[in-house]
């Protein structure tokens, strides 16, 4: 099993040290090709790594603020794009066709049912004009939409709004997220990588540069329905357990999928926490 080989190479040499120190969270700064690999999906022969430890990926910006925030009930700004779109821009190397996302509206409705202080914007209401100025008012910004990494030009990688507009990584760096704890990109492709893997943390870096403490993104295209299950579990845990860190809530949500019929790492391991989820 490749995941077990990588565990033996990366974790086994320090496993006893982690146990002796009673480590609860692995703060991970992957380099080059290791950025392709979700640490959660490594296996010790009995358990997945995420079943033993929380995982927090970091960028250089993460190192400037690793303080833990006081626990409080979250406020969420949630936007979703459920419609199919074709994106064409002069500065993009090609056009991109996106299928409908059948489960995202249900995902947002479930989040709002658990966290009443949630503002929901769907399709034509989910525009940059309606969304970007409001983000700084919320602790969590959640986008259930398509994203695309543009190979060779990662600064033009983008997420799709519900009216067909896009926000590139450059645009994200100008967002005002100083009071935002977490930006969740619950989308089909928000952290796909190429080359040395520099793009994967480029997203987290852009979100943090704009002021947010952390981001959650995905390493590969994820099934729409399993994403809904994981994300609603994540928010339920955060809402019902205010003492949970972001890293712990994501860990428990991933474990819930491990214990379900969607237990293959394809479904739960690509979700990465980038930044400060402590």
Give the positions of each predicted feature:
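Catalytic cores of nucleophile-dependent amide-cleaving enzymes
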Residues: 139-229, 233
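An often Trp-containing, charged/polar helix-loop segment at the C-terminal end
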Residues: 226-278
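Short acidic loop-to-helix transition motifs that present clustered carboxylates
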Residues: 122-130, 166-167
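Second-shell loop/turn segments in exported
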Residues: 1, 94-101, 121, 190-193
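Active-site-proximal beta-strand/loop segments in catalytic clefts of secreted hydrolases
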Residues: 29-32, 53, 79-83, 124-125, ...
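Charged, well-ordered internal alpha-helical segments
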Residues: 1-77, 103-114, 126-147, 155-156
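Short glycine-rich His-centered loop
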Residues: 72-100
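Short helix-loop-beta junction
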Residues: 102-119, 206-215
